[in-house]
A protein has these predicted regions:
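Two-metal-ion RNase H-like nuclease active-site motif
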Residues: 3-12
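Short, conserved beta-strand segments within well-ordered enzyme catalytic domains
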Residues: 7, 20, 59-60
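Short N-terminal binding/cap micro-motifs at the start of the first secondary-structure element
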Residues: 14-19
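Short acidic-glycine loop/turn motifs at beta-strand connectors
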Residues: 23-27
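Conserved DEDDh/DEDDy metal-dependent 3′-5′ exonuclease domain
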Residues: 30-115
Length: 115
């Protein structure tokens, strides 16, 4: 069986969190939003669990240093979080780049799926 390959990107704002995922070698694109206008938390969590359960491999521009830690935190919280909480984590990652840029990295053994 071929490993599922997925490209992922996140965007964070104080009141909006977005995650876009595209299954490579297919036309399947998934867009998830957590905001006052739309709450895809449950479906995003289910999608990320599907990636985990199917041993997917994810790719992204800054998955190691930014998107991955946000996804990891979201998964650790069981998908029960807010855009504000994810934004605060994103800001902590950005602000730590000069002092301790590895503080928010997720060890490979702690990742819900490969990235």
């Amino acid at each position: 069986m071929t490993q599922i390959a997925v490209t992922i990107d996140t965007e964070t704002y104080p009141d909006v969190f977005l995650l876009v995922a595209r299954i490579c070698d297919s036309d399947l694109t998934f867009i998830f939003e957590i905001s006052p206008y739309r709450n895809d938390s449950e479906s995003l969590y289910m999608f990320l669990c599907w990636l985990r359960d199917n041993h997917a491999r994810c790719y992204g521009f800054n998955l190691l240093g930014f998107d991955g830690p946000l996804i990891h935190m979201f998964m650790q919280m069981g998908g029960k979080t807010t855009a504000r909480t994810l934004y605060e984590k994103a800001q902590a990652i950005i602000e730590s780049q000069d002092e301790d840029k590895f503080a928010h990295m997720v060890r490979p053994t702690d990742r819900p799926f490969e990235w």
